[in-house]
Amino acid sequence: MTADDRIKLEPSWKEALRAEFDQPYMSELREFLRQEHAAGKEIYPPGPMIFNALNSTPLDKVKVVILGQDPYHGPGQAHGLCFSVQPGVPAPPSLVNIYKELKRDLNIDIPNHGYLQSWAEQGVLMLNTTMTVERANAASHAGKGWQFFTDRIIEVVSEHQPHLVFLLWGAHAQSKQKLIDATKHLVLTSVHPSPLSAYRGFLGCGHFSRTNKYLEQNGETPIEWRLPPL
């Protein structure tokens, strides 16, 4: 499998990740997904949306990286951006807590939807470290090869340009810290925004205002975290 026209991938990412498509793990991952589909399993997000994080945020446009774990596994939720859901789908509990922190931190009213596409289009790379999942089976595709691909994405972003902000929420995201050059970038960590942990430090972390302050200090336009209405 090579990075050719069969893979709908934004050109800067296709070039930066070209070698990954020739790696043995990618062949194994492709075969695993083929077998899952052949067995009649429903896989999320839908095929054209798997690389939405990369296609929405070209490499040269990345300012902020938010790491998630794996896609939502309910019907109609996942569309390739971590924490985000498709229009018309209620915001899941972790995203509700993200909104609560935005309200506390920047006084941004909580929106009536969970579609974070506008963040991606401003330069927020919203990357799940496992990019697919079986319906109603959380973490079912963990350890199948995506981790090698997304580790390389994190390394490429860290190497490519200085003065990015990495938001690492929870132990899984923080396990990727070793891939990031902290001398070039701002790395902000907290517990996960899940209702199980958000009260232990996510609510009150101030990550959104701190992100924008760092971007402005380094000559970048801040992120407009306020989502447009749908």
Curated annotation (Swiss-Prot):
Its main location: cytoplasm. InterPro entries: UDG_fam1 (IPR002043), Ura-DNA_Glyclase_AS (IPR018085), Uracil-DNA_glycosylase-like (IPR005122), Uracil-DNA_glycosylase-like_sf (IPR036895). The active site is at residue 70. The keyword DNA damage applies. This is Uracil-DNA glycosylase. CDD domains: UDG-F1-like. The lineage of its organism: Bacteria, Pseudomonadati, Pseudomonadota, Gammaproteobacteria, Pseudomonadales. Pfam families: UDG. The keyword Cytoplasm applies. It comes from Pseudomonas fluorescens (strain ATCC BAA-477 / NRRL B-23932 / Pf-5). Its EC number is 3.2.2.27. NCBIfam families: PRK05254.1-1, PRK05254.1-2, PRK05254.1-4, PRK05254.1-5, ung. It is found in: Cytoplasm.
